[in-house]
Amino acid sequence: MKSAVETLNPTRVRLTVEVPFEELKDSLDAAYKKINQQVTVKGFRKGKIPARVIDQRFGRGAVLEEAVNDALPKFYTEAVNEAELNPLGQPEVDITELKDGETLNFTAEVDVRPTIEIPDYSGIEVEVDAVEVSDEDVEKAVTELRERFASTSPVERAAEDGDVVTLDLEAKVDGEVLEDGVAEGVSYTIGSGELLDGIDDAVKGLEAGGETTFTSELKGGSAAGKEAEVTVKVSQVAARELPELDDDFAQLASEFDTLEELKADSRKRLENMKQYDQATQAQERVLEKLLELAEVPVPEKLLEDEINTRKHNLEHHQLGQMGLDLEKYLEIQGKTVEEFDAETKEAAVKGIKTQFVLDELVNKEKLNVNQEELTEHLMRRAASSGMSPDQFAQAVVEGGQVPMLVGEVARGKALAVVVEAATVKDTNGEIVDLDDEDETESTPETTEAAEAAEESTEDKPEA
């Protein structure tokens, strides 16, 4: 076999392959054997039909077609390996010449990973939010904790903001009660915004036994996005009573003895949360700068497939679970189809570029993933998917997606290398030190930042 490669553009090549006919012998033998098992000829036992009889009865062309179909993947793979290519997706194969007893010639066009020059990233500078926790932040956190320990007691008066009401609901569209539009005994805190638009105004002022009707656009269910006539009946009004903010409350709501200790712990927790957000922000902005510096051509077919994958995942998984179609989703978002398509393409391009650049950086820095890192990442992914670690691991193995997880961790480590080399300042002009670990150690934040940019570039395990 002889092969040559022609570069059509930075992301696509054409392989030209010439195969001497004698190298098709194994495939021809396999073709005769396969046809032997599929056909019957009077006078011959199944599987014992001579080759010349098959040629006479079914045509030599049928045998050659079967042999070529069997041989093409092998010769294509050999040509790819000889040229040291990294193909993306399936090739477009064209048989240019097939002469019985002489030769098989074909071409194969395929997208390939582009050659990427990793830029000097040591000069990257980004700005992030400063970690600042005010007294008001602490008071808000303590108040939210206090709200969780509130008690309720029924009252004989009209409902008002902050009350907990027990409701019976019935929704009609075009005069018909929806199958999924009836609910009884729903507990709702007035002002929380957790139910339908307009329900707060509807129930305020009603006492137990009171009933009213209002209109609201349904956000989910079988009639999502439609205007519904909602009848609401109040069966109980209960006032919420908050515990006193004192040392007794601190002992009730936490492991601390005093309110001051509880507030100090709340401040520390808020600082930790803001530091986490700050680190994530730094990683996302460093990645954006890196992608701006790198020249990364994107294969057209890969981009097309990625856009289609993202749209499919949105329509058939995310929106399907919400009871929405794409048209209604865009209406809620206030976007046109053109705006949605542009945003989807932009996200797909970023995802592909992120994977290409970080993969190249993994190779350049010779980064490896050990078993402990892979296990930790698997545990995080399992938790975020709502599956147990064992279930998630089984889904990954059965789906042949272990290399995908390894790639995610490796790219997280590559991003960590770039973040380590970057200068990160907060909005106060202070240098932010994110170097709590070895520079080549991936953190949950760097891995998640890389994943967020890639999003659906690779298949994900399904529950």
UniProtKB/Swiss-Prot annotation:
The keyword Hydrolase appears for this protein: no
Gene3D superfamilies recorded: 3.10.50.40, Trigger factor ribosome-binding domain (3.30.70.1050), Trigger factor, C-terminal domain (1.10.3120.10)
Biased composition annotated in UniProt, kind: Acidic residues: 432-442
Organism listed in the record: Streptomyces avermitilis (strain ATCC 31267 / DSM 46492 / JCM 5070 / NBRC 14893 / NCIMB 12804 / NRRL 8165 / MA-4680)
Protein's gene: tig
Major enzyme class: isomerase
The record's note on its domains: Consists of 3 domains; the N-terminus binds the ribosome, the middle domain has PPIase activity, while the C-terminus has intrinsic chaperone activity on its own.
One GO cellular component, as annotated: cytoplasm
Keywords of the record: Cell cycle, Cell division, Chaperone, Cytoplasm, Isomerase, Rotamase
Domain of life, source organism: Bacteria
GO biological process: 'de novo' cotranslational protein folding; cell division; chaperone-mediated protein folding; protein transport; protein unfolding
Protein name as annotated: Trigger factor
Localization terms from the record: Cytoplasm
